[in-house]
Design a protein with these regions (language model features):
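A glycine- and charged-residue-rich anion-binding loop/surface
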Residues: 1-171
Length: 171
């Protein structure tokens, strides 16, 4: 467009000035966390789970419409941004299971709440949020309310059906 109007642009100086401005303005840090900062952790864990056969190459199965409960295995736990093999009472964790019946926030409808618990009832995690931090990866975010869940434990994921119904009715 500049050439069409007989103007010249010093692109090198422009790029240099833009970089100086970007750094002086905090390089976008004033906005805080924009999401996606920890995506490599999720991608790495997903690749590992696909490679060892725990997940298909399509990742975590997602069907929040036909079921409100699924059985599975605790494939992964993330605490403080790092994969762990076990969590303890009071820990805030992200839980990975092979199949999710929890609705992920979309189109103005909030994520489901519910419980992921051991099939043998030795532990329980109250789920307060569900996210998809990378393609194929779904994490259930919650707090261990009793016991000590471990990767490899058999688990049951149960959506709070009353809460979902109330949200759907008002959405």
């Amino acid at each position: 467009i500049a050439r069409e109007h007989g103007l010249e642009v010093d692109e090198a100086s422009f790029k240099s000035s833009m970089e100086e401005h970007r750094l002086a303005s905090g390089a976008g840090k004033a906005m805080g966390s924009l999401g996606g900062e920890g995506v490599d952790i999720y991608r790495g864990l997903l690749a590992e789970l696909e490679a060892n056969g725990s997940l298909p190459n399509t990742g975590v199965a997602y069907d929040p419409y036909s079921r409100r409960q699924v059985d599975g295995v605790l494939l992964g736990l993330i605490a403080n941004g790092k994969p762990v093999t076990q969590a303890n009472l009071g820990d805030n964790v992200e839980v990975i299971i092979p199949d999710s019946c929890f609705y992920i926030e979309s189109g103005g409808q909030v994520s489901d709440h519910g419980v992921i618990s051991a099939q043998n009832e030795e532990w329980e995690i109250q789920i307060q949020d569900v996210r998809k931090p990378a393609a194929g990866m779904i994490v259930h975010i919650g707090t261990v309310t009793f016991g000590a869940p471990q990767v490899g434990d058999k688990a049951v994921a149960t959506v709070d059906a009353q809460r979902r119904q109330d949200i759907m009715r008002n959405h």
